[in-house]
Amino acid sequence: MRNIGFISLVVAFLASCTSNGTTAPELTPFPEVSEPIAITQGPKDHLFASYYGINSWSPDNRYVTVLETDIIDRLSEDGEYATIGLIDLQDNNKFIPVAKTCCWNFQEAAMCHWLPWADDTFLYNDKREGKFVTVILNWKTGEEKIIPYPVSAVSRDGEWAVSINYARLRLSRPDYGYAGGGQDAMKDVSWPENDGLWLVNLKTGEAELIVSIASLKDQMTQMQDPKGLAYFCHTIISPNAKKIFWLARTVENLDAQAGFVSKWQTTSFTCDLDGGNVRRCFPDGWGGSHFNWKDDQTLAVTAKWEDRVYGHTIFTVGEEDKVQHIGAGILDFDGHCLFSPDGKFMSSDGYFNEYFERSWVMIRLEDQAVMPIGAFYVPEIYRNTYTRCDLHPRFRPDGAQIGFNSVHEGSRQVYIRNIEWK
């Protein structure tokens, strides 16, 4: 990591004094963030076992879920397994292998989530008997429960999950899908009636299609290509488990994009947990890319502000017309939005720049001041879009640590940083 100075402040959009010379309210100090501490090491590559923003720490904060793989510079194929392991933070970062999965990728890994309603238990996606499923595993006893739907998002209470079609995603966005045909990709149906968002009860295994792809045809970008595909991806459930945010996309000319799909159109949506009250988040042209819930009603989404420039936005569901452009100019990039547990700060990291460095900043939401907290070099072997190593940060639930993936020391490994809040 290039040391860019912890206390340097890039910009503050609000002055420290008001226009009439009176002193403004005292601002919350930025936290101290330690240098990165590697918790995995080679020769194999490692990454957190889930997408950014998802908690990887066990309830007692002793273990962290990671993925281990020999594959470096290509997508995995059907039957190629990665190892799911636990890093024991109290035993010299010992790697404990606990499961294997062939449903994984370099972006979302295997979508591991700890379940608060069962001791020593987490879930992950896998392929069993030819089908993509969720495995609920007690890693100490080895006891498993199979849910016949792969998860895309899990509620904080661990009771609900959203499932999408990862086989269709392998066609339309290969770096986020799974190989092996464990679901019907419906590749000959542009707007399927029987595919979309599935709400899954993780305790009973029951599931219901709550929003079909076809039902949103009139609200999504239209396609001229008869072989084009509409699909859903990237879902997240609100903290109180009452709302869902997701991205709906259309992609055309897949034959011409064979081997590297890079052009699609995005529409951002929210709905209630039961699929009701579907709302578009933005006007035409804004799209949507990365996102996170700040609280039960407020979202941050990187989108194309006024159809001009990608930036960070914050809005309240139901008041989308009051959307705010955060850090205009400084934060005009497509970053992974991540809120501190108290909601006062937002972390964001972007794609690598012309110097092949991934920058990482912390934003104080009170005044939109921005502080750099890192810049991480990307070696050539990790610059491919499909096998890239995004930082994909995630806070420990108590905010005392933040973890991320990085290749700045030559291989894909997992790091944590200690945080001291003031």
Regions found by a protein language model. Name each.
Residues 37-82:
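Beta-strand-rich domains and repeat architectures in extracellular enzymes and scaffolds
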Residues 54-65, 104-127, 152-160, 164, ...:
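Blade-terminus and WD-like Trp-Asp/Gly-His loop motifs, strongest in beta-propeller folds
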Residues 309-311, 327-369:
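Loop/turn-rich, solvent-exposed surfaces of beta-rich toroidal or solenoidal domains
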Residues 67-81, 164-194, 246-264, 304-307, ...:
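Short, conserved, GDST-rich strand-edge loop motifs in beta-rich repeat architectures
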Residues 285-287, 327-338, 369-394:
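Conserved blade-ending motifs and adjacent loop-strand segments that build the rim/top face
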Residues 50-53, 71, 76-127:
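Blade-loop segments of beta-propeller domains
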Residues 37-46, 97-106, 205-228, 372-385:
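Surface-exposed loop and turn segments in beta-propeller and other repeat-based domains
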Residues 103-196, 210-226:
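Asp-box/WD-like beta-propeller blade repeats and closely related beta-sheet repeat scaffolds
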